[in-house]
Amino acid sequence: MNTKNITMLAAASLAAILLSGCKSGDSVAAYHSAPVECMGVEHDGSQTLRVTGTGRNKADAIEQAKKNAVREVLFKGIRHGRQGCNMRPVVTEVNAEEKYENYFNIFFADGGEYLKYVSMADERNRSRDKAQAKAFVSYTITVRVLRAELKERLRADHVIE
């Protein structure tokens, strides 16, 4: 092999290495969910939240976001965003989600009872954020969780005292 061929081979290899490094990587935004954020509290005790959900399509992602909002209010409390949202969860019993697993499986089923306690009243045009990965999409939406009504329902069903 002569010097010209070696130089051409080296240049082609270098170009291939440099160009492969220019490929944009896959977005990881859809793989991470942002914490549920408090946007405000209404006079009736309901909480306006900014929440993310992930699903196979837009409808699944939005339904999952609603479930995440109710689940956060029930079991974790709202710790991010503006002041005013109740940091204390509705269900304070340790391992209540596991203890009442059958109840909450039915409650959080697709199209389930949880939908009675979530409102899209505070959703504004163009207030949704979208991230997409190869297999799923992630949407961040604004919802209102009817905390007082939710608490009353759990009392009536003897989940909380």
Question: Where does each model-flagged region fall?
Answer:
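Bacterial N-terminal signal peptides that target proteins for export
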Residues: M1-A10
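Hydrophobic helical h-region of N-terminal Sec-dependent signal peptides
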Residues: A11-A15
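Domain-level marker for long, solvent-exposed, non-transmembrane regions
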Residues: C22-E161
